[in-house]
Amino acid sequence: MPNITRRKSLAFLASAPVAGWVLGKESQAAALAPEHQWKQVDPREQIRQRYFPNVVLTTQDHKKVRLYDDLIKDKVVLINFMYSSCSQLCPRVTQNLVKVQKLLGDRMDRDIFIYSFTLDPKHDTPKVLKDYASMHHVGPGWSFLTGAADEMEMLRRRLGFTDPDPELDKDKESHIGNVRYGNEPRQLWGACPGMSHAEFIVESLTWVDWPKGQRALEP
Amino acid sequence: MPNKKDIDNARKNRLELIAAGLSRRELFKMGLLTSAGYLVAKKGLSSRAWAYDHGKGGGGGDGGGGGGAASPPTRGFVEPLRTLTVKQPVASLNPAPTIQPNTAAGEGRTIAHQAFTKFPPQKFYQITQSQISATVSPDLPTQTFWGFDGETPGPVYHAKYGEPILVRNVNNLPANNGGFGNNTVSTHLHNGHTPSESDGFPCFFFNSGHFYDHHYPNVLAGVTDPQFAATNGDIRESMSTLFYHDHRIDFTAQNVYKGLVGQYLLFNQFDTGDETTGFRLPSGQFDVPMMFADKVFDPNTGLAFFDLFNTDGILGDRFLVNGKIQPFFQVAPRRYRLRWTNTGPSRWVQFFLTDPNNLSATFPFFQIANDGNLLPKPVQVTSVELGVAERADVIIDFSKFRPGQSIMLENRLEQQDGRGPTGNVLAAGQGNNYLRFDVVLPAVADNSQDPATITKFYDLPTIDLSNVVRRTFQFERGNGQWQVNGQFADCNTNRFTVKQGSTELWTLVNSSGGWMHPIHIHFEEHQIVSRNGAPPPLAVERSRKDVVELHHNETVQIFFRFRDFTGRYPLHCHNVVHEDHAMMALWTIGQTGDTNPNP
């Protein structure tokens, strides 16, 4: 019978996970059962590590902020991607989110925030984004964010605003128009199209809101 | 095709194993090597090889749907198939069920039962949704899932036509979701001829700490039609294999992935659940529900991982049947009825029976039902394709195999991402094995009828296009957003109203060559009138269905009769990731309808 060591088998398995693994003998099954020490990771921490790299970004007001620490942590948020020279979808979604912002009233900038990340950081300087925000009459609690091109691209991928078709993915005009909504400490994340009815976007946001509007976790 | 790096890795690993003394044949038997010489879990089947895909796009940094994780190694076929618990009724419920929502007692229902008086429940059930612990494999740690009555899949209902039941659905799900899942839920009885308020409508979700009474009349479609008064409905509309799953708008994928799924069987005077009567279909321990799922497990924690930010579709690289990864199933040399359900989230499958020691052998078997509805008669097949939420009842005769023989249930449909299968059917032995049948139990009596000799189950209901309302639905993607006729799911928008008692002809269009969609329409079964202008080519599609496979660039016309109940229902893509990203239209059956052709 094969003389395969556990170390070898695991090294091999780690490099290419295996769909089906039949073992010939009971004794082998015992020998190969993982003595693995599984890591205990807080799911909230796992989500942070996987999706929210703590990169430094700049707002339309030239403020330096960190993605997780300053924008996401402990908050209810709406996230989308846009660029200021986009002539088709972005202005419509931005106008729609302006309606959302109005509907959210004084909760904006208190515990609910909107973040629009630029897809065109080379052109979209804080000043350009400031002009864009002013033109759309954007109110407080809504940040337009730019940063280093490679970090903006990493963010786009981490946050899932990509298309599996590489040609479409390269084409900014066909960029992903979804708005992601979520509550970071409650680990509740959903998404809706940016052109959904503003009232329905607000309703969706209430589904991940604090219970009874109180910023506290149920037991 | 695998890229050069994959091939190099495969070759390197293969050499290492061969150097360790394993022959190719042994490698293959272990499931480590395909007949073409590549490792089994090559890109395209393992969905998600983090090492290969990292940084190539998609939620969480990659394109495969698992969010940057490839599951840790697990052995296949070390645990038996789990027999699902049969749900038992209770003598009574306290407080007693009421027609109006019992808000004061904590009921989350908001609409009165419409058919409670007409079909008063004769049996009562109480089922509880809660956080549970479950093991999926001896090689992975105990998982924290959500389940029904402490199990996932939940218990199986054995219901009967003519015996209305009431299920009190108690929500004890925790606020702390462990990373994904929404504890406000709406349980859909998939395929049920169910009044809207009991159907599990996506927007009728209710909170933890509350309950929701579902009234399932268990009646044939046409029950209120005078022409079928003598038979309490149209016997040709009989259903057999249904399932239940969470349908919470925007969170269905997370909640089903977390375990909120189970089976519901319906019997009648023909499909009796007793192989000595009626159609004499294999019964009792030989009538076996198999719920398929694919999942990814985090390589560090060993726990089920859901890619929160994937919008295309999530593919797992571990394959579960009834909640266990790749179980074995010891069978006797006789006929079995297997009830197959693809619970997703996104993978399409095409199952073949494979003898790992003789890959060129083919094993025909009989498909007897499509989407839980018995076909006009059994159809002999060598494979069964299932989009997400499709079901197939099959009869496999294990007396045709050698005593001691092991046969794999192998998915040979190649799929690399959430867009749908590539169209390639892989060679035998190169797919993914979901389960292994071991023909090792002693011979036992078989009173079931050989399906080759069954000439008729139910005729198909007539299709009458003389007076139909015609509607067209385009299933599209625009700016990465899923649409039905250019619009998005919205709980507050009714897209169209079907007049109760009318017939309709719907044209479902997928103009994309890139994406495939399994489209599910609630409440009434439909029949496929045409697929790309021609009658459906597959015999098993000349049937009653509730999920339509919309392949690339396809146009499918389907015929409906809308009867018996009124209220709100959805139509949606059942790739639950697409569904959660708004590929759903909400509509109504009412006393008066509209004729909007492009709602």
Segments and roles (model prediction):
Chain A
Residues M1-P17:
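N-terminal secretory signal peptides and thylakoid transit peptides that target proteins
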Residues L23, S27-N54:
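N-proximal helix/coil linker or "cap" segments that precede and/or mark the start of modular domains
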Residues V56-V76:
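A short beta-strand-turn-helix
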Residues D69-L89:
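Short active-site neighborhood of thiol/selenol oxidoreductases, capturing the structured segment around
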Residues T94-I114:
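Conserved helix-turn-beta segment immediately C-terminal to the redox Cys motif
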Residues D111-D124, G141-D150:
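Thiol-based oxidoreductase modules, predominantly thioredoxin-like and allied folds used
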Residues K130-I176:
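Short, internal strand/loop/helix patches
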Residues L168-P219:
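Thiol-/selenol-based redox modules, centered on thioredoxin-like
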